[in-house]
Amino acid sequence: DVYKRQKQIEHELATGNFLIPSTVTVAEFLMDWLPKQCSKHKWAPKTYQSNLALIQNLIIPYIGEMQMQKLRPYHIEALYDTLSKTPCGQYVGGKRRDLSPKQQKRTLSGTTLHEVHQLLHNSFLLAVEWGILIKSPVPVEAPKKTTQERSIWEVEEMRAALDSMEDPILHLAVHLTLVGALREGEVAGLTPEDIDFDAANGMGTFTVNRSMQRVQKDTLAQVDKGCILRIFPDKLEGSKTSLILKDTKTEASCRTIFMTAALREELKQWLERLKREEALDPERYRN
């Protein structure tokens, strides 16, 4: 038996298939892989946060204790099968939650399973490069994404929605969103410097190049802060999250949008109001 094992090792060394035995688990590997990839690719805070959530809530609870070298494709397929029947939010921050009967009926989407597959695919390829695995156990075929058709509001629906809003801040935020197809963080990240009333022959434009986000403080300690323009002071003592202002993700996300006449007028009135408020309380607008 010793002789056979010696010959087997010699053959594996000759063919480049020798693997140093390792007891590293899936959880240990992924929690080592995550910060390294974040640093290498300069992930944005939300990218790090979403990948951490996938690992903590959808991978570690099910296969985290398994040793990497004992993992086989059928284990990954079994994980996908389990996740397809798992309620959304079953685990948060790596801790299991008790869900109501209604909550238990809403299971994870195919898109979420696809994201888990992509993370495992990318990370386990690196495990091969690192010499932990000879071959990735992640199946070639990924879970099918869930396709949902988005409904687009008609002009009448947009007008009705705006007419129903009495709060001027909410009205302006929704108006900007509808005209520019903005995300929530992009609306919050707009400043007076982004607005040009004279552009486009007086039609007016506004430029989207920043986004406001709320992220975990643990995340901020891990990510590259090059894209972060400002971290706002906490309003509540002991808060576990921070409000940040950051650059948009890509050059494509940075865009200039034409105003409608109604939006142009509303923005002018809003900026005039801000100037009046600033004159009455300069300290509020200095921070």
Residue spans for each PLM region:
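Phosphate-coordinating loops and pocket residues in cytosolic domains that bind phosphorylated ligands
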Residues: M31, K70-P73, K85, I134, ...
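Conserved tyrosine-mediated DNA breakage-rejoining catalytic core shared by Y-recombinases
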Residues: A142, E157, L190-R276, P282, ...
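C-terminal flanking helix
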Residues: Q56, H121-F124, V128
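N-terminal DNA-binding module of tyrosine recombinases/phage integrases
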Residues: D1-A78, G93, L274-N287
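Short, conserved phosphate-binding/catalytic loop or strand-edge motifs used
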Residues: Q69-S84, K95-S100, P139-P143
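Basic, Lys/Arg- and aromatic-enriched nucleic-acid-binding interface segment
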Residues: G89-L119, E129-L190, A200-M203, A252-C254, ...
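Arg/Lys-rich amphipathic alpha helix in sigma70-family domain 2
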Residues: L125-I134, Q269-E272
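Short, basic/aromatic-rich helical patch in the C-terminal catalytic core of site-specific tyrosine
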Residues: I76, L120-F124, V187
